[in-house]
Amino acid sequence: MKRVVVTGIGMINALGLDKESSFKAICNGESGVNKITLFDATDFPVQIAAEVKNFDPLEVVDGKEVKKIDRFIQLGIKAAREAMQDAGFSEELDKEEFGIVSASGIGGLPNIEKNSIICSERGPRKISPFFIPSALVNMLGGLISIEHGLKGPNISCVTACAAGTHAIGEAYKSIALGNAKKMLVIGAEAAICPVGIGGFASMKALSTRNEDPQHASRPFDKERDGFVMGEGAGALVFEEYEEAKKRGATIYAELIGFGESADAHHITSPTLDGPLRAMKKALNMAGNPKVDYINAHGTSTPVNDKNETAAIKELFGNNIPLISSTKGQTGHCLGAAGAIEAVVSVMALRDGVVPPTINQLVKDDECDLDYIPNISRKVDLKVVMSNSFGFGGANGCVVFKKVD
C-alpha cells in the first residue's frame, strides 16, 4: 500500500479564522462559546453556541454569489483555500489525479429552514432557484473542486459527527488504491440556526448553562450536561509520500491508521463496543504503535464521555495515552469536527504540545484518566489518534505519526 501524508492544512472555527490563530487559542485554553448572535435565541431553552466571529463571506465569495451559497460552504471554501495554499503546489499540478472528499453532518440547514418558511408564508413560487444547490452536502466539494480545478474523485461523507473522520479514511483509500495521487479533505458545518438549536435542544443533547457560556462545555467533567453547538471547517491535503518528497513539500504527518465501525444499537445513544472496534481497527492498520495522545470525541455529554473513557481503558490497559477534548474550546462542530480535530492533532504533532481539556472542574469517578486539565502540556509526540462518533452509531478513528 502507498504511504499517505499530510502536506497542507486549514481551519476556521469560533477561536480563529485560520489554523495558526485557532490552534494558539485552543492551546491557550480559550473558549469560543458565547451567547448566540446569528439569530434571536431569547425564547430558546439553549441560548449559547460557538459561532465563528468576524467572518466576512465577501472575502470568500463574490458579492453576487453570497446569497446563493450556504454558510457551511462559505466556511469550507475558506479552510480549503488555506490548506491548498499551505500545500504549496506549483502550476504544473496534475489536477486529473487530484480529488476531494467533503463532509458535513447536516449541510445547508439554515437555507432549508429559510426556504421552508418562504414556501409556507409566500408560496412555492418564491422559493430561491439556488436553494437546493446551496443545501446539498456534496455542493461543498463541488464548488471547491470547481474553484481549484480538481478533476479526480469527488465524494461526500454524511455520517453525522463522524463525517469528517470518515472523509479522511475515504481520501486514504483513494490514494492507497491508486484512484488519485492527491486528495483534499474538507469538513464544514454551520447549523447554528433556530431549527438546528431547537432540534438538538429538544433532544436534551445541549448544555443549558446559558448564564455561563464559557464554562458550559466541559468534557469528562462530572457536572457536564450536554454539548455546545459549534460551527467551522477543517481542511487537509493528502498525497503519496514519494510524490510529496519529490516536490519538496512540507510533510506534517503520515496517516498510518484508519478504522470505522457501526454500533448497530440506537439512533442516538452510543455504545462502548462500537468506538472500541473502530480504535482497534485503526491501531491494527497502523501496526499497533505506541500512541502518545488521543484527541477524544469528548462531547461533554454524560454517556459519550463515560463510554469513550471505558473504551480507551479496555483498549490500552496500563499504557493509556494522554487524552484531551478540544470541544470545550471550539464547541461541537458536528460533521466538521473530525476534520477540525485532525488538523488540531497534526498541529499538536508539529509543535509538540497537547491541547488542554478546559473546564475540568469536578472529577468524575467514571472519567478518571489524564485529560490534560485546563492547561496545555509540552510533550514530544510521535503518534496521535483522533476519534469521532456520530448519531446512527457511526464511528471513525484515525492515527497519524510524525515523519522524521
Predicted regions and their residues:
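A glycine- and small-aliphatic-rich helix-loop capping segment at beta-alpha/alpha-beta transitions
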Residues: 20-27, 110-124, 174-177, 197-210, ...
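ACP-dependent fatty acid/polyketide chain-elongation machinery
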Residues: 1-65, 242-254, 343-357, 401-404
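Acyl-CoA/ACP chain-elongation machinery
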Residues: 179-225, 258-272, 298-305, 320-370
